[in-house]
Amino acid sequence: QVDRVLYDLRHNPASRRIMTNLYNFQDLHEMALYPCAYSVTFNVSGRTLNAILNQRSQDMLTANNWNVTQYAVLVHMMAQVSGLRAGELDFAAHALSILRGFRTVLERQGRPAPAFVMDPEVTDFYRFTRDSFRLEGYDPLPFDEKIPVAI
């Protein structure tokens, strides 16, 4: 699916059919947990790549930051290797949960967001490595809470 998306972004960017889908029905019976984040639709507007992430379920405390971050980075990667600018990531979580007793975690005063930096020299999607990315100014809040995760 990734190869097809990359091909279309370069050769058919006006297409409204540039998407991935992780929901393989024939494999669901073998999975302990069905995919939560299951589809991304890419849309090119001018020279800007935008995306919509659909997710069937999400726990706000344990998964939101991971999901938003990893798919935002994916948009940046796809845009860079396709000669586009990264635009917006819209996110639709269909069954969002916030555990009781952890509201204080959500109400804490945040800190300034770090800067995301990606190696501008990478032009082949499959040549990205973990060293291709870094965060500058990351100052996380302490987090000692134990949050239960439902499987």
Language-model regions, residue ranges each:
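Terminal, non-catalytic protein-protein interaction segments that mediate quaternary/complex assembly
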Residues: 1-151
